[in-house]
Amino acid sequence: MATPTAAAEDRGDRPFWIVNGVVSVLSLSLLAYLLLLRQGAGDKTSLAFMPAVNATFNGASAVLLVLAVAAIKEKKVARHQKLMLAAFASSTFFLVGYLAYHYVHGDTRYPGTGGMRIAYLALLASHVVLSIPVVPMCLAAFYFAFRRKFVTHKKITKLLFPIWLYVSVTGVLVFLMLRSAYG
């Protein structure tokens, strides 16, 4: 049973959970709209460089996440914080670039067939499904770290780290598979 102080603190977190929910739902809704409903502007040359830039941001996020976890295991808190902020910034830049690209281009279909298409679709499906909780979990991890609620922060990050890392790495793999299929 929670102590009165813990219960009061939990109620104090309520505005964060509301904002986190709104931000998460809005970002997922925008992404779903761009990928599933909007057709794109039709100009295939505009922002054609963005998939490579986005893959670079994803790759950077993956490296920064691994370095950040190594830093905290070595009790290098300041380094961990800087690396996590950099990973968050890199993932944020990825998301902005991804949204901009798909706003212009709409959805990108994999042109291959056979086993490669099946492998691509399986990888893409796992990437998409696991990317859904990254934004709200990331916001929660940062929130509880800034509030110095490290027990809660650690519980969230034990789940978040492997998911965020997987999504970052598979984002690069999806790009490479599309790039090789389109030549």
Protein language model regions, located:
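Alpha-helical membrane insertion/targeting regions
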Residues: 1-183
